[in-house]
Amino acid sequence: MQLTLEFGGGLELLCDSEKIHKVNVDLPNGADSDDFTMKHLLSWVRTNLIKERPEMFMKGDTVRPGVLVLVNDCDWELSGQLDTVIEDKDVVVFISTLHGG
């Protein structure tokens, strides 16, 4: 499954300072594309893209409070959060809304 993942608001620093990642994600064994959800994607991101301080991006199985998640420009809170189904060629954006001052 081909996806575009974008990180902003400082989260790109956790991914070798790259903001945009075009990735190929393998489906879990026995899963079809209708079964691939944000929960699976977040696990994949933690394992394959986050290079340092994963606790700044995730808390448990989900993103930390203060991280805005958009799936194809739609807030994931409107589409089921962890249960949001991810499809081929989707664009998923993670933006930290927490800033120092």
Curated annotation (Swiss-Prot):
The keyword tRNA processing applies. It is found in: Cytoplasm. CDD domains: Ubl_Urm1. InterPro entries: Beta-grasp_dom_sf, Mopterin_synth/thiamin_S_b, Urm1. It comes from the Eukaryota. Pathway: tRNA modification; 5-methoxycarbonylmethyl-2-thiouridine-tRNA biosynthesis. The modification 1-thioglycine is found at residue 101. The keyword tRNA processing applies. Keywords: Cytoplasm, Isopeptide bond, tRNA processing, Ubl conjugation pathway. SUPFAM superfamilies: MoaD/ThiS. C-terminal thiocarboxylation occurs in 2 steps, it is first acyl-adenylated (-COAMP) via the hesA/moeB/thiF part of the MOCS3 homolog, then thiocarboxylated (-COSH) via the rhodanese domain of the MOCS3 homolog. GO terms for biological process: protein urmylation; tRNA thio-modification; tRNA wobble uridine modification. Its main location: cytoplasm. GO terms for cellular component: cytosol. Belongs to the URM1 family. HAMAP family: Urm1. Acts as a sulfur carrier required for 2-thiolation of mcm(5)S(2)U at tRNA wobble positions of cytosolic tRNA(Lys), tRNA(Glu) and tRNA(Gln). Serves as sulfur donor in tRNA 2-thiolation reaction by being thiocarboxylated (-COSH) at its C-terminus by MOCS3. The sulfur is then transferred to tRNA to form 2-thiolation of mcm(5)S(2)U. Also acts as a ubiquitin-like protein (UBL) that is covalently conjugated via an isopeptide bond to lysine residues of target proteins. This is Ubiquitin-related modifier 1 homolog 1. The gene is URM1-1.
